[in-house]
Amino acid sequence: MSATTRSATSIKVLPEPAGLPEPLAEPAVGELRLETVLGALSDPLRLGIVRKLLLESEEFDHSCGWFGLDRPKSSLTHHFKALREAGITRQRQYGLERRSHVRVDDLDARFPGLLDLVADWTPTSR
């Protein structure tokens, strides 16, 4: 499985492997709302999660442990759920583990250029 990199940014788009579990409940492409997506991305931790998935992913999807976030499990569960319910990420259940990836094609279809802005954003120190 080889990744393709979009020319405008270094967003990696990996093909979906065969035999994946069904995704958890999420909004359809036509149900994605800009205010909901931007609301989810307004949290710096969630914005960082999405950027890491877009720019550093070498696998199709990742568990929350891959991100190296020093947060309680309940907090991470909340943030990943917010991203999924906003339609930004797709999650699948693998036994006891949930793995996530960004819905690049869906978000590009609904909000062209949004993910390029997210990928190009440079975090500032507070």
Where are these regions (language model features)?
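N-terminal helix-turn-helix DNA-binding core of bacterial DNA-binding proteins
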Residues: 36-72, 94-106
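Secondary-structure transition/capping residues
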Residues: 60-61, 78, 118
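Conserved acidic functional residues
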Residues: 43, 79, 112
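A short, conserved structural fragment
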Residues: 84-94
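Canonical helix-turn-helix DNA-binding module
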Residues: 65-86
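Amphipathic alpha-helical dimerization/coiled-coil segments
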Residues: 2-35, 51-56, 93, 103-126
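Charge-rich, low-complexity amphipathic helices
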Residues: 71-75, 89, 98, 105-106, ...
